């Protein structure tokens, strides 16, 4: 793997020196190998090791290089036609392949090649971008979007219209991460590499980026870029220092309890084979 990452890193540094037409074969092969690994889940842009999230920047660079190395081409889907550089993930899949993957894909959900969905993932009419990783038993509900290289944990519910930010444009250093057992309420947006830690519940209509104040009303502490594990978060505001106006903030109102869990529990019937 070190050889693969070295080729990608060097190619990215020298990307101005070649085009899709004259790209060296070893670079093209390395980019394809990286995308295949992202697509089948053997590689991922970020992973938790010894309690810390480690970002493999070289894989993000491989994704960016793939746009340079591939030309746009017509992509057909029934009566619809598209023109893009990235194939859709499930194009040409057989019933056997879907059964083996254990993923349910409701039309017209779209996942790009280079994204991964683990067993018992349900894709309602939604969009999953290249480099994203969606772990087991997670539902991506209607009109939700999972951005490029975003990391979604196990047993997560992304409600209708949720937006999980990507890293490619505007270019971000780290992917947005939703850890295991989280619930993200309808129309909420989590972007700019924010980490929502395990078991957190985000209410409907909460918007969190790196500059968003995340205020814990119990302790008075303000967090940036991280929602602590087990938090229940709602939209709110905090007063300015002079008291003349208020600015948006995300408010931690409590820790998850049995009542919260009952309201946000997953329905196994929707994930049955």
From Swiss-Prot:
Entry's localization field:
Cytoplasm
- The EC class name is transferase
**Which PROSITE patterns has this protein been placed in?**
HEXAPEP_TRANSFERASES (PS00101)
Instruction: Please tell me whether the keyword Amino-acid biosynthesis is annotated for this protein.
Output: yes
UniProt keyword list? Acyltransferase, Amino-acid biosynthesis, Cytoplasm, Diaminopimelate biosynthesis, Lysine biosynthesis, Repeat, Transferase
Matching entries from InterPro entries are given as:
DapD_Trfase_Hexpep_rpt_fam, Hexapep, Hexapep_transf_CS, THP_succinylTrfase_dom1, THP_succinylTrfase_N_sf, Trimer_LpxA-like_sf
- The principal location of this protein is cytoplasm
Q: What would be an example GO MF term here?
A: nucleotidyltransferase activity
| Pathway where it operates | Amino-acid biosynthesis; L-lysine biosynthesis via DAP pathway; LL-2,6-diaminopimelate from (S)-tetrahydrodipicolinate (succinylase route): step 1/3
Q: Per the UniProt entry, what are the Gene Ontology biological process annotations, in alphabetical order?
A: diaminopimelate biosynthetic process; lysine biosynthetic process via diaminopimelate
Which NCBIfam families does the entry mention? dapD, PRK11830.1
Complex formation:
Homotrimer.
The family line of this record is: Belongs to the transferase hexapeptide repeat family.
Q: Which PANTHER family match?
A: 2,3,4,5-TETRAHYDROPYRIDINE-2,6-DICARBOXYLATE N-SUCCINYLTRANSFERASE (PTHR19136:SF52), MOLYBDENUM COFACTOR GUANYLYLTRANSFERASE (PTHR19136)
Its name, as the record gives it, is 2,3,4,5-tetrahydropyridine-2,6-dicarboxylate N-succinyltransferase
- Please name the source species: Acinetobacter baylyi (strain ATCC 33305 / BD413 / ADP1)
**Name of the gene this protein is made from:** dapD
